[in-house]
Amino acid sequence: MALIVIVVLFSSCVSNRKISMMKKIIDEKKLIEKNLETKITTLNDFRINKSAIGELDDKSNESILKVLDTEKKGILQRTDSLNKMEAMLSGDKRIKIKEFKNIESIVATSNDIIAVKSESINFVDQLLKQQTFVKFNTAAFFNAGGFKIPEDKMDEAKIVFSPIVDSLIVFIKKFPKYKLNSSIIASGFADATGFSPGSLVDLLTSNMGKTEATKEELNSELSRLRAEEVSSILLTIYNERIKELANTGQFNTQFFKIGKGEEFPNKKIDNYQTDDERRRIVVIYWNALPE
């Protein structure tokens, strides 16, 4: 009778060989997760640097950070699950077949999860490696104190702005199976030069719904209006390009215009001056991330 009990007991448990093989598979999964985590850390450092030197706008920066944080959280959760299963397999208690099959199922499912997550991380990698911006001095297209591009400079402006739209479209077309949310952002910057009383000050102040405004507020509004003008041209170019495409359903692009005012365009430059053409710029960015 005792012999029968022992036979039944052992037949309901998993062999040491199977446990050893599963522990090896789990170690391999943990290494893959560790490599993904290392890649996320590298991408995050790259993101921080691009943002600091003005090659990544605030909206894109926040969106990419959110994706990376989400993926890192997932890695930590999956690694924790793998560690718990490994501890169970390494314990003194014998593993029953039902418990082992549950571990097998979880580990098998992780293959598909890791594949999807790897694609997401690789997508961000490719996005960060793209040159997703173009900048130009405001004097190239705007008259002093002006925020409308003159008609005689409009064709030239479209030639300069078109590549940023084209590069976004090319990037999106590389990922036909993704439904992407994309953005084109025009950010205007100004130096700290003051304003003489006159019609420009009156117009900018009125635009802000005020009777008086500080120099900083005036520069912020002027930079916003210039960004708005650039954004309207970008939208025209974008709509023209989209008409030529067969699958327009893949494209969901928003346009943003932001006045940065006297904020420094490049946070790593420490010798900006009050009157400085390096600060009088408009920067156009694009981004595209999976929904």
Please provide the spans of the model-predicted regions.
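N-terminal targeting segments with Sec-dependent signals, encompassing both cleavable signal peptides
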Residues: 1-291
